[in-house]
Amino acid sequence: RNETLKREQPFVMSVPASEADPSYPEDETILVQGIIDAWFPEGDEIVLVDYKTDRVKEAGELKKRYEKQLAYYQQALERTTGKKVKEKIIYALALDEELVL
């Protein structure tokens, strides 16, 4: 299925500060940095995978907690690769379950 699995890819990108917190002025920017657990190209698009070790009762809780984080990961990958992220997957290790966002 995958062509090349990329792991632990660090990134730093500039985003409007108001995107992180609406109380910031529109013209200010902040740096967002992180490490993307895994991703792979699938055709002309990308599948993003994030592993979570949180102990939760259901995977849906992880969606609420990490939706914004994965949106930043998506933005970083799309900027650096020029490809569209077609799927974001959170893999809940404690539940042995995947959640597609």
Residue ranges and their predicted role:
Residues 1-101:
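Structural signature of nuclease core domains in nucleic-acid processing machines
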